[in-house]
Every structure is written in structure tokens, then in C-alpha cells.
């Protein structure tokens, strides 16, 4: 069975946000959603355990591994991948509901390179933003700042982070998160520029020409 075609809309903005662990993606994503209330966050399904403060259905849909695998068999994911021993996936229903909402003009996906590659294969017009740490030592320091994780887990995440950064050229934009406010302003600028692209607003220009009164 092939993936169902999703409703199309020239001005509906689809954005991938990706980064290695510790680059500040989660914080930046929350700020962007506050700045752009007409964007929706794609809530992924995952088999990992919730972290302190995370809410089921808001941060992730937390599911058992067998339930996740059943959804895979039923082709209910636009993308899915295994990261750090846990499964993550983007449900087709997330995008379908967002596009059916007249108040929604776009969706943000918080996914890694594996998932981004799968989504872009099905949605080639999607915009990809990759967030970089200022230096690798700073990234390691941030990872070690997570008191809930052991040094073994930190080293594994650091190794995966290096492999993630190797795929930087896949993305359309790179944002260095040395200063959170500066990084946010740059990402905000990217979204504003994307909304003004000719391909998104061509229908507006064409309607002006079509409706122009004769002189």
C-alpha cells in the first residue's frame, strides 16, 4: 500500500527542525510556536519513557513498542526511525488534521536526519533547518549537564551527534546556537522569508491580475 497523498496548499508551510542532542532544538521550537500561533507542532509517537515534565499528547504520544510496531505494519507513519534504542514516528494523521484546520498555516517537525530524509522523499517541498552547537566541547558540556543521564549515555549521544552533523548539507538552512536569542531571531527570519517565497504567494499575484478591472 502506498502512502496516501496529503491535501496540497501552496502557502502551507512545512518545516523540519533537526539537530544533534544538546543543541537547543527543543527550547527554540517552543519559542517559535509561541511567536507563530498559526503553526502546529507535529507530536511524534515514541516508545521511550517520558522525561520529567513531559505530557503525553503534548510533547509526545508515548506508546508501547508493540503498539508502535503495529502502526508501522499498518503504514500509519509518514516517517519512523530508531534512535538511541527507542522508536520515533510521525503520524499521517498529524498532518491531515493540521491541513484541515482553517486556523493552521503550517507545521513544525522535530525529527532527526533519518526521519527528515523519509519525509522529504514524500514531501520534497519541505523546508529543513539544522541547528548546530558553537563547538563540539560545548556540545559535550551541555550533554553532561543533563544530570539524569549516565556518562555512558552521554558518550553515546555525543557519538550520534557527530554522525548527525555529517548530514548538515541535506538541510536548507544552518543555525548556530551560541546565543539562544540570536539563534531564535535567525530562525524567525527564516520562517518569515519562507512565507514570502514566490512559490507560496504566486496564487495571490495571479488573483490580482485576474481580478484587475479593465482600463
Task: Please identify what each model-predicted range represents.
Residues 1-15:
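Extreme N-terminal, non-catalytic leader segments
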Residues 2-4, 148, 166-215:
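NTP-dependent small-molecule kinase module
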Residues 18-20:
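P-loop (Walker A) phosphate-binding loop of NTP-binding proteins
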Residues 25:
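Conserved lysine of the Walker
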Residues 28-29:
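Post-Walker A alpha-helix
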Residues 34-42:
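Post-Walker A helix-loop "phosphate-sensing" segment adjacent to the P-loop in P-loop NTPases
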Residues 46-107, 113-117:
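ATP-dependent small-molecule kinase phosphotransfer cores
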Residues 106-112, 121-145, 176-177:
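Conserved phosphate-donor/acceptor-positioning beta-strand/loop module used by diverse small-molecule
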